[in-house]
């Protein structure tokens, strides 16, 4: 007993997958079938015991803070957009308490709202900036409407701007609503659990994550995908790495799946 194997090498995952799997699913949906065991090796834990079946909604917010530039020696003549941005970043922590629902399926179990990137403003030290732009990465539990989080962010921004005499524009630069999760008893989840048990002698369990993978696109197309690999918790950190031993052990698990060895487990 052996399973036919298909391998999809797709681009653009970090920026929305419009030119990668999204393009493939749109133009060649015949390549995939609801009976396929679709495994995306893009998330996991150090023991190789997490099978990801659900992902949070993703939204990237862009905040443009507008003030009035002036010479730094006469700050009263301007409106400091950097100070406004700093105040707003601090105020936006209120989102955590407004949307504090928890779901134990996910790690972490709550929605997260994290300021990440700030664009350069003035090139010199002696100028009060009149415009600052920063971004916030939001990973929102599926039951929370993204529209409500945008509205809350704008309400918080309005409070800061009215106090400081600034203008703030809040834009959703990227949104990806959560797909329906892969059922924990889906065939692909069971097959992975049996293969992990046979190869590694460990029990793997279904879980959800805040990160985004191409599995979301499969799920939105009605294809129950699972995400699995053995991963050291170093994603997007300095000196990100994986261990060769983990890769070799994962290869054995995939070989077990390919050969149908999980059926005998």
Annotate the PLM regions.
Residues 43-48, 53, 59-265:
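Metal-dependent amide/peptide-bond hydrolase catalytic core
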């Amino acid at each position: 007993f052996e399973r036919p194997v298909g391998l999809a090498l797709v681009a653009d995952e970090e920026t929305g997958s419009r030119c990668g799997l999204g393009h493939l699913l749109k133009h060649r949906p015949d390549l995939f079938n609801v009976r396929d065991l679709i495994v995306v090796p893009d998330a996991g834990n150090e023991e190789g015991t997490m099978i990801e079946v659900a992902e949070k909604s993703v939204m990237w917010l862009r905040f443009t803070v507008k003030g009035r530039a002036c010479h730094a020696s006469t700050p009263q003549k301007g409106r400091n957009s950097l100070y406004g941005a700093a105040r707003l970043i601090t105020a936006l922590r209120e989102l955590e308490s407004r949307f504090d629902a928890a779901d134990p399926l996910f790690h972490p179990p709550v929605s997260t709202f994290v300021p990440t990137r700030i664009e350069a403003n003035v090139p010199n030290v002696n100028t009060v900036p009149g415009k600052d732009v920063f971004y916030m990465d939001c990973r929102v539990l599926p039951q929370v409407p993204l529209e409500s989080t945008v509205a809350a962010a704008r309400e918080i921004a309005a409070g800061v701007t009215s106090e400081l005499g600034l203008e703030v524009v809040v834009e959703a630069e990227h949104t990806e609503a959560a797909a329906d999760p892969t059922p924990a008893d889906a065939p692909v989840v069971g097959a992975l659990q049996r293969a992990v048990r046979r190869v590694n002698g460990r029990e793997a369990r279904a879980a959800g994550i805040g990160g985004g993978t191409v599995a979301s696109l499969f799920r939105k197309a009605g294809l129950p995908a699972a995400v699995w690999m053995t991963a050291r918790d170093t994603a997007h950190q300095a000196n990100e790495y994986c261990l060769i031993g983990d890769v070799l052990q994962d290869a054995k698990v995939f070989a077990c799946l390919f050969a149908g060895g999980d059926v005998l487990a």
